[in-house]
């Protein structure tokens, strides 16, 4: 079956030539989740008011779980880390060291006020990033995020390598994506990641796939791929 998100025209997700470039910011130290959410709320409001430029914020969190608007309490199997309810879409996910989180604050009213197109754009951004490391990421119609096939684990097995969760206020996006670079994958065993309980579907990372990449390598690839989909950064 063709995933209908693959057929969405992404061309209009970028701003016209000459528009201000997106600010690209990287935090070197882990950022507490409540601090990150508060900062996103402030920045998104400022973008909506025309008082601040768009922003992509790359960071890592200390170990924690977040629950989206579709989360089921039963999907938290072992509450070994703090759990934070959040207004993003999706279910329960894990964030922690070794995972590159990218919070994306874009004015979709100026770009394209279409949530499905925006999510497809985030997926394409991740897929293009993975291509830098010769990893084939794929969309799935019934599973949000980006997946890689794992024939080494058996027929039909796939692992999730990146998660997506978004929220919009006044057509400004926040929250965003998370790519597994080298997290402790055992931390995912305490939840049903994103509500997917089928044993054929697991979680992986770039390092788990045998790629000796660093967070800095991923950041370079993320920036190049972002500019392909959403336009220039500064």
From Swiss-Prot:
Ranges of residues in domain BPL/LPL catalytic: 50-234
Pathway: Protein modification; protein lipoylation via endogenous pathway; protein N(6)-(lipoyl)lysine from octanoyl-[acyl-carrier-protein]: step 1/2
Highest taxon in the source lineage: Bacteria
Residues with site note (Lowers pKa of active site Cys): 160
MF-aspect GO terms: lipoyl(octanoyl) transferase activity
UniProtKB keywords: Acyltransferase, Cytoplasm, Transferase
Main subcellular location of this protein, as a coarse class: cytoplasm
Gene Ontology terms: cellular component: cytoplasm
Function text: Catalyzes the transfer of endogenously produced octanoic acid from octanoyl-acyl-carrier-protein onto the lipoyl domains of lipoate-dependent enzymes. Lipoyl-ACP can also act as a substrate although octanoyl-ACP is likely to be the physiological substrate.
Family annotation (HAMAP family): LipB
Miscellaneous: In the reaction, the free carboxyl group of octanoic acid is attached via an amide linkage to the epsilon-amino group of a specific lysine residue of lipoyl domains of lipoate-dependent enzymes.
Record's protein name: Octanoyltransferase
Protein source organism: Rhodopseudomonas palustris (strain BisA53)
């Amino acid at each position: 079956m063709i995933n209908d998100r693959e057929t969405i025209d992404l061309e209009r997700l970028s701003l016209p030539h000459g528009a201000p470039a997106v600010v690209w910011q990287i935090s070197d130290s882990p950022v507490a989740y409540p601090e990150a959410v508060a900062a996103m709320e402030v920045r998104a409001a400022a973008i909506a008011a025309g008082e601040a430029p768009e922003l992509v914020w790359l960071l890592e969190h200390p170990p924690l779980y977040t629950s989206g608007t579709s989360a089921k309490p039963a999907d938290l199997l072992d509450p070994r880390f703090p759990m934070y309810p959040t207004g993003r879409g999706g279910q329960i996910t894990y964030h922690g060291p070794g995972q590159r989180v990218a919070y994306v604050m874009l004015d979709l009213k100026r770009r394209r006020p279409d949530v499905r197109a925006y999510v497809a754009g985030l997926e394409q951004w991740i897929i293009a990033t993975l291509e830098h490391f010769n990893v084939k990421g794929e969309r799935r119609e019934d599973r949000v995020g980006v997946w890689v096939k794992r024939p080494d684990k058996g027929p039909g097995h796939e692992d999730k390598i990146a998660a997506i969760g978004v929220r919009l206020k006044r057509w400004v996006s926040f929250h965003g994506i998370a790519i597994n670079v080298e997290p402790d994958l055992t931390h995912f065993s305490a939840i049903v990641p994103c509500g997917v309980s089928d044993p054929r579907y697991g979680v992986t990372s770039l390092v788990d796939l045998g790629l000796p990449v660093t967070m800095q390598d991923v950041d370079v690839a993320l920036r190049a791929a972002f500019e392909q989909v959403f336009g220039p950064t500064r």
